[in-house]
A protein has these predicted regions:
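A metal-dependent, Asp-based hydrolase signature
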Residues: 1-32
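Acidic, Mg2+-coordinating phosphoryl-transfer loop and its flanking beta/alpha structural elements
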Residues: 33, 37-38, 93-133
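Glycine/Thr-rich beta-alpha phosphate-binding loop at enzyme active sites
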Residues: 53-81
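Short, acidic/turn-prone active-site loops that include or flank metal/cofactor-
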Residues: 56-63, 118-122, 135-138
Length: 152
């Protein structure tokens, strides 16, 4: 019987990808920043703490009093795309970055979409998005997109 404490202790033993903390700090110093993820808040909490607790929109788990996972609650279907659409309806300019197929509807809905370290099949299927492979390249692509939108 796997309990939430077992899973979160494993996640807590992990460290952020090298450069992630500095990247997020740099991003947040310039623009409001949201992380949209298909994870669950209870899984993400240890890592988000190490990243300085950035704003995270994701799903939640149902956990009983003993710590056993009983189920999950999906915020809404395709929540990344819907979040970007809501922000653009509020006249925010949105630059989105993602690494996989499940991010492409979000990238398409944003004012600018950037693929970050995607697998080859995603690059091939979505050639309209620029591809970057490190945090320095991602920051440059974001800054360039922001400049093009008059947001720098």
């Amino acid at each position: 019987d796997i309990k939430i404490e077992h899973i979160t202790s494993i996640i807590d033993s992990m460290e952020p990808v090298e450069g992630a903390i500095e990247f997020l700090q740099g991003l947040e110093s310039k623009w409001p920043t949201l992380i949209l993820s298909d994870t669950f808040s209870q899984f993400a909490k240890p890592m988000m703490s190490k990243l300085g607790n950035p704003t995270l929109f994701c799903h939640t788990l149902d956990i009983d009093d003993t710590g056993r996972i009983e189920g999950w609650n999906i915020r809404c279907e395709d929540h990344k795309r819907k979040t970007v659409e809501a922000l653009t309806k509020l006249n925010f300019k949105v630059i989105a970055s993602g690494d996989s197929y499940n991010d492409t509807s979000m990238l398409s809905s944003a004012n600018a979409g950037i693929l970050f370290k995607p697998p080859d099949n995603v690059i091939e299927e979505f050639p309209q998005f620029p591809v970057v492979n490190d945090f320095e390249g991602l920051m440059s692509a974001i800054e360039s997109s922001a400049s093009d939108m008059g947001e720098l």
